[in-house]
């Protein structure tokens, strides 16, 4: 029975689903969230997406900040009142007009001028220069700075106008507007950094960011804590100190003020910490999902490096690791192609050493008939193409019957069954593979005739050569016998010959496909050999 999810897990999952942040979603987005689109998205469409995200969040954050500032001024500091103790044209005229004008002009200026100018290189599909990368990484700071300036101007303007009616308003207005402005700027900084991930990824492709533009995880966390929690808590303490000095609030009004400021701190603090956790968790989850794919053997594709902190270095390190694994797999594949998969696997399992061991194995030798005339009468390119088709059939059948292509020698191939990997009945595998090769050559390449010889017995298999250069090979009577049988098979109607000893050692099922023939003395052998041919 699955364990019940905690409240934190449920809240996290709800936020992930609502924002399309990576986590338990079916597929991990390249930039950590589906809100940011795909890597293959066109620059123009990406710009529209970024503009919409930044515009919507700036509008939402500022409207929320304005409402909170109004609540703080109205309920946290009810005396003096902005409705009864101040000119109406300031409360209902100048304040709404400035808020509307600043919100409209600020949003337009940020999205159209500042953001577009900083990422113009990405929209125009140009490679980022050092200045372009610097401007892109500085963009969240500039967005936050514009917000602080506009909020400070508004606070100074309203404090001056309200202060003409009552000097107490100066402290109240400056305090309320400044606190809310800092919180709004912090939120906009973090969310702008999130929205710019696709462009930041392009900038980070050109190189690592300068240290002064990448404060790191600790710097980012401490900054968010200071602005999201430290400043509001300082504001609460300042409020209490102000009341103690001025004595303009009753005990109930002070409690209300502290309560409102505390709730505001909790809400905005939660919001900025959630965005911070969002920004921090996304690169980790992307790397985690990629590691899971690597565990399953998928080495395709690199991660998009979209974070300028140590998390970006983690993404770079993952890409370097995967590149190393891909290179290792490429070398392993090349090694396996050159020496055989089984030999390569054995070399990986244990340190290769010079020497050999006795093995009971079967050997198949395949050689093209009339290869000299073939080379003389055909263009070289045609000969190579024909040999590749020929060897493709041989390799395919040898692999299918669990054998090893030990070497290619011109137009001939030597296959081993039972070394380095042991087989219960190497004779069965070798005889079946030889029959399959002969059948396929007759059907698929009738223009090519090849002799095939099969022999089995005790061989010595191991690494032969020097310490600097050696290769896996087999030596023994069955190897020589298979080569002589192949030579004899070139002039035999069946084109395929095996020794009777090999046939006798095979299973009854495989023997049913063969029949015994004449007895001959092979070249270089003193003892006669009885031949076996396929039926």
From Swiss-Prot:
Family membership: Belongs to the adenylyl cyclase class-3 family.
Transmembrane regions: 63-83, 90-110, 143-163, 168-188, 226-246, 258-278
Main location: membrane
Membrane topology value: Multi-pass membrane protein
GO terms for biological process, alphabetical: cAMP biosynthetic process; intracellular signal transduction
Keywords of this entry: Cell membrane, Membrane, Transmembrane, Transmembrane helix
Keyword Amino-acid biosynthesis: no
InterPro entries: A/G_cyclase, Adenylyl/Guanylyl_Cyclase_3/4, HAMP_dom, Nucleotide_cyclase
Domain (Guanylate cyclase): residue spans on this chain: 362-486
GO molecular function, one term: adenylate cyclase activity
UniProt subcellular location: Cell membrane
Protein name (database record): Uncharacterized protein Rv1319c
This protein's GO CC annotations: extracellular region; plasma membrane
Coiled-coil residue spans: none
Residue ranges of every copy of the HAMP domain listed in the record: 279-330
């Amino acid at each position: 029975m699955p364990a019940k999810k905690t409240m934190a897990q449920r809240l996290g999952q709800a936020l992930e689903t609502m924002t399309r942040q990576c986590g338990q979603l079916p597929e991990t987005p390249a930039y950590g969230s589906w809100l940011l689109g795909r890597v293959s998205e066109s620059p123009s469409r990406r710009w529209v997406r970024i503009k919409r995200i930044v515009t919507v969040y700036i509008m939402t954050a500022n409207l929320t900040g304005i409402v909170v500032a109004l609540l703080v001024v109205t309920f946290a500091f009810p005396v003096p009142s902005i409705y009864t103790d101040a000119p109406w044209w300031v409360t209902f005229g100048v304040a709404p007009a400035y808020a509307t004008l600043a919100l409209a002009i600020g949003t337009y200026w940020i999205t159209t001028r500042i953001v577009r100018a900083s990422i113009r290189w990405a929209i125009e599909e140009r490679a980022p220069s050092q200045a372009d990368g610097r401007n892109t990484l500085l963009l969240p700071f500039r967005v936050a700075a514009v917000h602080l300036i506009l909020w400070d101007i508004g606070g100074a303007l309203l404090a001056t106008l309200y202060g003409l009616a009552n000097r107490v308003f100066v402290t109240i207005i400056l305090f309320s507007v400044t606190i809310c402005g800092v919180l709004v700027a912090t939120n906009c900084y973090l969310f702008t950094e999130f929205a710019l991930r696709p462009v930041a990824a392009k900038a980070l492709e050109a190189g690592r960011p300068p240290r002064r533009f990448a404060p790191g995880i600790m710097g980012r966390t401490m900054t968010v804590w200071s602005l999201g929690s430290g400043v509001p808590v300082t504001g609460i303490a300042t409020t209490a100190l102000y009341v103690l000095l001025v004595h303009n609030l009753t005990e109930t009004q002070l409690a209300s003020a502290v309560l409102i400021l505390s709730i505001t701190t909790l809400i905005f603090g939660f919001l900025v910490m959630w965005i911070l956790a969002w920004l921090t968790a996304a690169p980790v989850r992307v790397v985690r999902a990629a590691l899971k794919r690597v565990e399953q053997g998928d080495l395709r594709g690199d991660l998009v490096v979209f974070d300028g902190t140590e998390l970006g270095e983690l993404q770079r390190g993952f890409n370097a690791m995967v590149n190393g694994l891909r290179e290792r797999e490429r070398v392993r594949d090349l090694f396996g192609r050159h020496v055989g998969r089984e030999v390569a696997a054995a070399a990986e399992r244990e340190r290769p050493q010079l020497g050999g061991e006795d093995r009971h194995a079967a050997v198949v030798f395949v050689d093209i008939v009339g290869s000299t005339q073939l080379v003389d009468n055909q263009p070289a390119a045609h000969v190579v193409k024909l040999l590749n088709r020929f060897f493709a059939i041989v390799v395919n059948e040898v692999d299918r019957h669990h054998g090893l292509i030990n070497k290619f020698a011109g137009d001939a191939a030597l296959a081993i069954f039972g070394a380095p990997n042991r087989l219960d009945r190497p004779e069965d595998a070798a005889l079946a593979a030889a029959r399959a090769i002969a059948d396929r050559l007759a059907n698929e390449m009738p223009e090519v005739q090849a002799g095939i010889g099969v022999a089995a017995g005790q061989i010595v298999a191991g690494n032969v050569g020097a310490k600097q250069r050696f290769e896996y090979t087999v030596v023994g009577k069955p190897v020589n016998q298979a080569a002589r049988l192949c030579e004899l098979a070139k002039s035999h109607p069946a084109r395929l010959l095996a020794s009777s000893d090999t046939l006798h050692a095979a299973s009854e099922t495989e023997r049913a496909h063969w029949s015994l023939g004449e007895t001959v003395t092979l070249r270089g052998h003193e003892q006669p050999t009885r031949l076996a041919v396929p039926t």
